[in-house]
């Protein structure tokens, strides 16, 4: 059932005044800057971490004002903004341009969100040194953390970057940059062997120093197990159920700005909100209160 269908609509309307203690409010984005220690504090307190994509100054400022802790300048911009068939064609200079736009948007409103930027396809696999050069481009554009996709083979690169002062978010499960090798956008880790591999890769990435780990299109039970096994690396789920330390969605998807079939793991928060800000605030509250995602509707 599409996430925007009627049975899913009622719980995710305009945020109510009765947010849980410690939850972000619509003005939370103006608070103290989010940092890695702050994200660790949220997890230790049992509060979910919220992340959304943004590709320009205006949407970044809106997400920050609505209380989103982490903004991801994702290479999904290739499909969302550039009309590419996948993320494979996204270039490093494009990622730097959009990272700078988002950073300026946050600076303009004295925002507090933590800014993560994707290392695009072909910008880090050749060598650790190539990865560092690429990461420097994004960090100098305003990113505070870089994200890279891949399993155990990326662990040495993660360690190399972290040792040189570059915070890293890893990414397992469905890795869109490998869509051709994976044979399409399919759930990963469904078999016993696949689940064992993902568990092992997650441990290797934590040991290498990854501070965050995106788990995409992974069975909910497996994502929960991985999360419980990683005390020092905070999992961010997308299509991975409610048991991760946080959630991320593509902004355009959760606003209903999708011309194709809505992914199973998405809910259209705009349909019950009166504004973009209201939709994002509703997403933040639904995640914080544990109402989104609903494993029965949005997970495998």
Swiss-Prot record:
EC code(s) of this entry: 2.1.2.11
Principal subcellular localisation of the protein: cytoplasm
Entry GO CC: cytoplasm
GO biological process: pantothenate biosynthetic process
Active site: 216
Pathway annotation from the record: Cofactor biosynthesis; (R)-pantothenate biosynthesis; (R)-pantoate from 3-methyl-2-oxobutanoate: step 1/2
Catalytic activities: 3-methyl-2-oxobutanoate + (6R)-5,10-methylene-5,6,7,8-tetrahydrofolate + H2O = 2-dehydropantoate + (6S)-5,6,7,8-tetrahydrofolate
Cofactor: Mg(2+)
Entry note: cofactor: Binds 1 Mg(2+) ion per subunit.
Binding locations of 3-methyl-2-oxobutanoate: 75-76, 118, 147
InterPro entries for this protein: Pantoate_hydroxy_MeTrfase, Pyrv/PenolPyrv_kinase-like_dom, Pyrv_kinase-like_dom_sf
Domain of life: Bacteria
Compartments it resides in: Cytoplasm
Chain's role: Catalyzes the reversible reaction in which hydroxymethyl group from 5,10-methylenetetrahydrofolate is transferred onto alpha-ketoisovalerate to form ketopantoate.
Family recorded in the similarity comment: Belongs to the PanB family.
Designated name of the protein: 3-methyl-2-oxobutanoate hydroxymethyltransferase
Originating organism: Verminephrobacter eiseniae (strain EF01-2)
Record gene name: panB
């Amino acid at each position: 059932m599409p996430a925007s269908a009627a049975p899913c609509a009622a719980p995710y309307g305009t945020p109510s005044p009765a947010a849980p203690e410690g939850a972000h409010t619509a003005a939370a984005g103006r608070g103290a800057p989010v940092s890695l220690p702050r994200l660790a504090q949220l997890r230790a307190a049992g509060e979910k971490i919220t992340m959304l994509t943004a590709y320009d100054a205006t949407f970044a400022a809106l997400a920050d004002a609505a209380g989103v802790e982490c903004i991801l300048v994702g290479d999904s911009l290739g499909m969302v903004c550039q009309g590419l068939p996948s993320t494979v064609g996204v270039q490093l200079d494009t990622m730097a341009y959009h990272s700078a736009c988002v950073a300026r948007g946050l600076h303009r409103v004295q925002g507090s969100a933590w800014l993560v930027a994707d290392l695009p396809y072909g910008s880090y696999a050749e060598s650790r040194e190539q990865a560092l050069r690429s990461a420097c481009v994004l960090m100098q554009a305003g990113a505070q953390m870089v994200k890279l996709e891949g399993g155990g083979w990326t662990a040495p690169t993660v360690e190399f970057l972290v040792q040189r002062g570059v915070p890293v978010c890893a990414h397992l499960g469905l890795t869109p940059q490998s869509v051709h090798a994976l044979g399409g956008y399919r759930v990963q880790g469904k078999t016993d062997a696949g689940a064992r591999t993902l568990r092992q890769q997650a441990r290797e990435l934590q040991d290498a120093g990854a501070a965050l780990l995106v788990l995409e299109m992974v069975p909910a039970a497996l994502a929960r197990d991985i999360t419980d096994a990683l005390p020092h690396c905070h999992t961010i789920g997308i299509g991975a159920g409610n048991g991760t330390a946080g959630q991320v969605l593509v902004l355009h998807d959760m606003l209903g700005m999708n011309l194709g079939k809505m992914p199973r793991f998405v809910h259209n928060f705009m349909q019950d909100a009166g504004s973009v800000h209201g939709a994002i605030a509703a997403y933040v509250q639904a995640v914080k209160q544990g109402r989104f995602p609903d494993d029965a509707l949005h997970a495998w």
